[in-house]
Amino acid sequence: MKVVALISGGKDSCYNMMQCVAAGHRITALANLRPKENTDELDSYMYQTVGHQAIDLYAEAMDLPLYRRTIEGASLDTGREYSQRDGDEVEDLYHLLKLVKEKEGVEAVSVGAILSDYQRVRVENVCTRLHLQPLAYLWRRDQEVLLGEMISCDLHALVIKVAAFGLDPEKHLGKSLGEMESYLKQLSQKYGVNVCGEGGEYETLTLDCPLFKKKIVIDSMETVIHSADAFAPVGYLRFSKMHLEEKTNSSALPLDSCPCLQSIDKMTEEQVYADEADAQGESTSQPDLKCHADGELLASCSARTTLGYRWLCGISGPQCDEPDIQNQTRQAFALLQGEVQKMGLELKHIVLVHLYVQSMADFSALNSVYQSYFGSNPPARVCVEAPLPKGQLLQMDCLLHDWVGTAPDDTPRHKHAMHVQSLSHWAPANIGPYSQAIKVDEAVFCAGQIALVPCTMQLLQGGALRQACLSFAHTESVLQAASSGLTLGHALQAHCYVTRRRDVPVVRRVWQRKLEELRAEEESFGEEEAQCGPLVVVVVPHLPRGAAVELHVIASHDDPRERSSSRVTTQAPSGAIECQVLLSGTRQCATVSLSLTLLPSAPATAGEEGLLQALRGAFGGRPAPSRPLPLPAVRQDLLQTRQRPGRTARGRADTVFEGHS
C-alpha cells in the first residue's frame, strides 16, 4: 500500500516506517503536526513537539514530500474513547491526513504507537473517517526487544528530552540509544521506567537510519531546563543549527525479520507431538450436522442476574423460501432492538454476540448491515457456520449487561472495549464489526480468534495444529491487553470450534500443553491448584476465512487458586450429559458448561432426541421436541427450560455438541 508516515522525528515513528517497508508497503509522504511559532514544548496528550526544528531536514534526508500543519486545537476529549469534536487537537490530525490523501492518494498511515491506547484510539478514529488503514507494527511489542532491534538495525537516535526519576538533563541529553540501552534497562528493573519511553520518560530525535539517503548532523544546540525538580528534572535540547551530509555507506534494511512469523515458527517447533490427521494441511467441512426445515424458533430472554447480565437468544429474521441475507439481517436487528427496548436497554448494552450463519459465503454481506447498528466500540463476537432451519440465514444469541445497584464493597464499575483496527505484529485487527474483547469489571469476553497472521491478515497455512497454536496465542494476547496479567489460565470457559472431527484431539493437546506451560511459569500459585475452565470443542461446517480453528474465551481476572467447581455426569441410553460449574475466586462470575456425547452405536436423530429428553428432565422436565434441534437452538431451548419463577441464574448455561462421538 501507499503509506503516509506520521513522524515526530523520534525513534518510534522512524522504526515503524522501517517495519512498513519490510512488510512490503511504500512510504510516499511524511506528515507532521508542529507547535505554534516560538514554541518548543507543547502540552499535548497526542504529539511530540520537542525537536520539531529538525523535521524539514528529516524529509529532505528521505527525499519525500512533507506535509505539516500547526496544532490549533487542545486536548479536550481525553477519555478512553474519542468522538469527533471541534477544537480538539485530534481534528488537526484529521485535516492534515485528509490533505495528504487528496494530494498523494495514500491508502494507509504509519503510526509509531507502542503502548498508548490513547494515541492508537484517536489515530484509528481519524483513519476510519478517512478510509485509511493504520499500520502500527510496534503495538504492544516487548520494549526491551524493540529497543534492541532499533539499535541493531542501525537506527541512530539521540535523547533530546528527559522527564523521569533517574534521568538527568545534564547527564543524559544528547546520548545515543546505544549508549543509553543498558542504563534504561536498569531503570526499568528498579523503578518501572518504560525502556522505550512510552510513559513520557524521554524523547528522541532520529539522525540516521537505513531509510535515510542523507544523515542529519547537529552543529549547535542548547539545553533548556523546563523543571528543576530535585527528583525528576525535566529538560530538553533546542537545536539552533543543523545540516545534512551524504552517507558514505548505507546499511541494508532487514526484510526477513517479521516478529509474527518468528513467533509462529517458535510456537509450532515447541509442539513436541505430531498429529497424522493434521498432515493433510487443509480444513474440510463437516457435513454431518443436520437440521430439519420445519418449525420456527422464538426469541427468548433469561432472567437478569444479580450483577446485571441476561441472555437474549434466538434472534433471527423470518424464514422464507428465497431469503436475502441483508434483508434478513435488518429484520433480525429490528427484532433485537424491539426486545432490547422492552428491557429498557439499548444495543450498546450488548457485550457479546454469538452469530450463527447458514452459509459463511454471506459473511461480508451480513457485516455490511451488521456494522450500521453499532458505534465505535461494538460488542465482542463469535461467528460460525451452523445448520439452521431452511430459509433462516442467521441467528444471534446476545449477552447484555447493565449496571444494577452498587458494586460489592463500593468498588467502581468499569466497562472497556478493546477494538484494535491497526495492522500490527500483536494480534489480528478486526475482520468485522466487533471488538476483540469487552471487559466488565473482572470479566473479559473475548471475540472468536482465528489464525490470521497479524501483519498480513492472511490465514496461516499448515492445518489445525499450527492454526490452534496461533489462535490460542492471539486469544492470550487479547486477554493480556484487556487486563494486565491475564492469561488463558484465567479462562472460566473456552469454546474451540473446528471443521473436522479428527482435529478435536489436536486442539485439546495444544490447549493442555498451553496450560501446563502456564502452570510451570506461575509457581507463585503455590501448592493449591489453579482451576481453569473447561475447553469444549465443537465441530461446525465452516469458519470465517476458511479457518480450521476458532477459539472463544470468557475469562475472569481473579485468583484461579480460589475458584470452586463441581462436575456431574448423567448417563442416558444414547450417550452422556456432563455438566461442569466453575465459580470465580471473587464469587462474582460463574459459568455452566454442558457437553452432550452421543454413543457411536446410537442413531443420530434418536440419540440426539434421547439426550435432549434427558437434558430437559434434569432442568425442569419439559417434553422433548418433535424434531432434532440445530446446534444454536439447543442454547435457546435450554434457556427456556431454565427460567423458573423466583430463580435467578448466575453466569450462563451454555450448551454445545462436543466434537467427540
Residue ranges and their predicted role:
Residues 115-118, 140-144, 165-166, 426, ...:
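Short, catalytically relevant binding-site loops at active-site mouths
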Residues 111-112, 135-139, 196, 386, ...:
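Glycine- and other small-residue-rich loops at beta-strand/loop junctions that grip anionic moieties
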Residues 1-159:
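ATP-dependent adenylation/nucleotidyltransferase module used to activate substrates
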Residues 138-139, 159-162, 208-211, 398-400, ...:
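Short, structured patches in soluble enzyme cores that scaffold and shape functional sites
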Residues 84, 146-156, 172-178, 394-400, ...:
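Short, surface-exposed amphipathic charged segments that create phosphate/polyanion-binding patches used
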Residues 15-16, 78, 119-122, 169-170, ...:
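Short glycine-/acidic-enriched loop or helix-start segments at secondary-structure transitions
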Residues 267-661:
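Short, polar/acidic, helix-capping and beta-turn segments at strand->helix junctions
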Residues 1-2, 26, 38-41, 55-60, ...:
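ATP/NTP-dependent adenylation/nucleotidyl-transfer catalytic domains that generate, transfer
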